Amino acid sequence: MSAESFNPSPTRSGAATAGAAETPDTAPVVAWQQGATSQQARWRSERGSPPPARVLVADDTLAANTAYQHACEGTGLLWQGDFNNARHLLQALMRRLDRPPRRQDAPKNEGAVVSADPAVAFNRHRQAQGQRARVLSMLLIPLQSNYRIALRRAPDLRLACEQAWGPADAQAPATEDGRVAHSVAPLRDLLGIVSAFEWRKKGVPLPALGPAPDNRIHPHYGVFSPLRGEYLDMVAQAPLPAAVQTGGVVFDIGTGTGVLAAVLARRGVAQVVATDLDARALACAADNLQRLGVQQQVQLKQADLYPGGRAALVVCNPPWLPVRPGSPLERAVYDEGGRMLLGFLNGLAAHLVPDGEGWLILSDLAERLGLRTRQQLLDAVAAAGLQVLGRIDTWPTHRKAADASDPLHAARSAEVTSLWRLGPA
């Protein structure tokens, strides 16, 4: 999977995964003791984490070391102090998590920490990142029914929350009392919502869509932001099959933000059918296609992979790492067992017109991390009754590729992303 900008709970351009919608009646609740009174509220977690079993009320008097100890033990801290101080406390928790261990705390067998096996190193990195996220998600913020945060110096996040979670509950009364909550969310999630709100507002300029300023994709909350332009450039520049040039239909499987469909439409493709299973992604794609003025060329359909019919070209950019997501947040990054990749390959031949092609956009990062071999990929292509017609390669230019402090630097710095041209064998 690419190291593109990451909105919370993303559906990637290429991911066709959706869960059941959560309603106030089905959402989990978080409970705490407010003095002598027991209280509870709707629990919101974009990681899909259960609410903390134990929650303490906290305010500005809480020391960072004490908060860190509670958070590491899985105790939620429901903040009722100054909002800016909550942000400072979250930063203090981050510093403690990111602090190198003292020498006396380091394992005796240091070889167990740094492994030469890239798959082992990757799994340890994921475990460390998961633990970090769990600890940081223990600092909780109460929200009113209209998404207002009734804390001192709290910003107005109502519009950002509505974009992320949908309309506020108009039936429930709001209150100025910060101790009363209609719902509770980790501060970390709220800051992610703010970041996503800003990304959506300003958009992401992508040269593959043409010259500025009419080349921006506006990712909605929960939809992956396509910041890695190198794979988009391949789609913008690869020769189109003759069947497309004579008016054939193109399928974009797992459209996400709609960026690949838009790139193809900007290339002059007259008819693109773009699919995704996730409602957030389809709404995002519709918005972007409208902004870019190509909505007449692209038809959006809610589908798990393929729509009906056949196409002259089928484009798919699935999640690149075939491992199990640890949370809904990771569905854009990880695809357990390569379900989407295999689904695309196994359905391709049946959905191509004569002389049609499939374009698979895939990084070899999984191979470099020991999660899949090149031979396994080629075997899957052959088993689907396909052959490789050609391949275009590109190399990453994103920050992580040059970050020597990244635990996965060796794999990321050598990563190659390819556009595989596939056809029936």
Question: Where in the sequence are the language-model features?
Answer:
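Glycine-rich S-adenosyl-L-methionine
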Residues: A279, L329-V353
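Class I S-adenosyl-L-methionine
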Residues: L378-P424
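Conserved beta-strand signature within the Rossmann-like core of class I S-adenosyl-L-methionine
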Residues: D355-S363
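N-terminal auxiliary segments of SAM/dcSAM-dependent transferases
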Residues: E4, P24-P205
